[in-house]
Amino acid sequence: MDIVLEIWDTFIGDRVYSALLPLSLSSTVSLPGLTNAANSSLSLFGASKPFVYEPATQLFRLEPSKYAYLSAWPRNNIYRQFLSFFLIVWIFGIIVYFISATLSYIFIWDKTTVKHPKFLKNQIPMEIAQTMRSMPVMSLLTAPFLVAEVRGYAKLYDSVDEEPFPYYSILQFPLFIAFTDFCIYWIHRGLHHPLIYKSLHKPHHKWIMPSPFASHAFHPLDGWSQSVPYHVFPFIFPLQKLAYVFLFGFINLWTVMIHDGEYVANSPIINGAACHTMHHLYFNYNYGQFTTLWDRLGGSYRKPNEELFRRETKMDEAEWKRQTKEMETILKTVEGEDDRKYLSQEEAKKDL
C-alpha cells in the first residue's frame, strides 16, 4: 500500500500535514517528545530516518513538492502513516461503497425485492447507517496492518524481476483467493457460534433479503475480522504491490456483487450472489467468500434453489412463501424471537 500512500501524500497529505503540523512546531515544548519518539526511538517498528524520497514503484515517479519537507511529521513518521491510512481506508472505502452499491442498485438489483415478505421497513437507509457507523472503526483496526506493510514487514515486491520464482506473479492471484477463502470460511463460520453470533454477526443478518447497500453493513468487529486474511496474506506470501491494490479493489466490488441479488453464476464452484442469498435466508449454509470448496468439505454447502435462476419464478409469491416458512423455522433455532420490523405490502407498493 506504499503506492497508495505516496499518491495520497503527493496530492493531499503533504499540504495537510504541513499546514496542521508545520516544521516550526518541532521547536515547541510539547511536540519534540512525540516527534522524537516517532522518528528515532520506536524499536518495535525500527528507527525512522530523515525523510528522503524514494519512489514506491518503478512504474512511475511522483516528485514531492516543497510541502513534503515542511511538516514536523515527515512522510516516514509512524503516527502520520497511521493517521493517513486510517483516513484513506475510511474516506475511499465510503466512496467505493457508495459508487459500487449505487450502480448495482440502479442497474442490477431487482427492485421488486422490496415486495419480499422479509424485506425490512426502511431497510436501505438502515443498511447505509450501519455501514457509516462501522467504517471508521474498521478503518482504525485496519490501519496497523498497512503501517507494518509500508515499514517493510510484509513480503511485498515491486517488479516481476523480484518475484520468488518464474510465473509467481500469475500464481499469486489464485493463491490469494485460495488462502483468503479458506480463512474467511472458518472466521465466518465461527461468527455463527451461539456465544458470539447475536453480539457480532447478527447485525449483518438483520438483512434477510439484502440490497447492495448491505454489502458493508456489519458490526465493525465482524467486518474487520473477515478482512484480516486479506491483510495477513502479504506477511506470509510474496505479493506484487500493484496486484495488492487491484485485489483490494476487487474484494470491495465482490462484496457488493454477492449482495446484488442477480443470480447469474449458477456454478458448483463459485460462491456467487445466489449462494450468499441462501446464507442470508437460511443462516447455517454457504459461509465461503469466493468458492464453495470449504462449504462442501465442511458440510455446510447448500445448492441454490433452481427457482432463483429463472425470472418468472425468482420473484414468485409461492416461492417467497416457501422461503419464508423455512427461514422462520431456522431463525427460531438461531436467534429465537424475530425482532425485525418488515415492510408491509402496502408500503412495498409505495416504494416501487
Swiss-Prot record:
Pfam families: FA_hydroxylase (PF04116)
Subcellular location: Endoplasmic reticulum membrane
GO BP terms, alphabetized: sterol biosynthetic process
Domain Fatty acid hydroxylase intervals: 174-299
EC number annotated for this UniProt entry: 1.14.19.-
InterPro entries xref list: Fatty_acid_hydroxylase (IPR006694), Sterol_Desaturase_Related (IPR050307)
Phenotype upon gene inactivation: Does not affect the susceptibility to amphotericin B, itraconazole, fluconazole, voriconazole, and ketoconazole.
Motif segment (Histidine box-2): 201-205
Gene Ontology molecular-function annotations: C-5 sterol desaturase activity; iron ion binding
Membrane topology per record: Multi-pass membrane protein
Key words, A-Z: Endoplasmic reticulum, Glycoprotein, Lipid biosynthesis, Lipid metabolism, Membrane, Oxidoreductase, Steroid biosynthesis, Steroid metabolism, Sterol biosynthesis, Sterol metabolism, Transmembrane, Transmembrane helix
This protein's record includes keyword Lipid metabolism: yes
One GO location term (cellular component): endoplasmic reticulum membrane
Residues annotated as transmembrane: 82-102, 128-147, 167-187, 231-251
Glycosylation sites: N39
Motif (Histidine box-3): 276-280
Motif mapping: Histidine box-1: 188-192
Cofactor: Fe cation
Miscellaneous information on this protein: In Aspergillus, the biosynthesis pathway of the sterol precursors leading to the prevalent sterol ergosterol differs from yeast. The ring system of lanosterol in S.cerevisiae is firstly demethylised in three enzymatic steps leading to the intermediate zymosterol and secondly a methyl group is added to zymosterol by the sterol 24-C-methyltransferase to form fecosterol. In Aspergillus, lanosterol is firstly transmethylated by the sterol 24-C-methyltransferase leading to the intermediate eburicol and secondly demethylated in three steps to form fecosterol.
Protein family: Belongs to the sterol desaturase family.
Domain free text: The histidine box domains may contain the active site and/or be involved in metal ion binding.
Role noted for this protein: Delta(7)-sterol 5(6)-desaturase; part of the third module of ergosterol biosynthesis pathway that includes the late steps of the pathway. Erg3A is a minor delta(7)-sterol 5(6)-desaturase within the ergosterol pathway, erg3B being the major one. The third module or late pathway involves the ergosterol synthesis itself through consecutive reactions that mainly occur in the endoplasmic reticulum (ER) membrane. Firstly, the squalene synthase erg9 catalyzes the condensation of 2 farnesyl pyrophosphate moieties to form squalene, which is the precursor of all steroids.
Protein name, entry field: Delta(7)-sterol 5(6)-desaturas erg3A
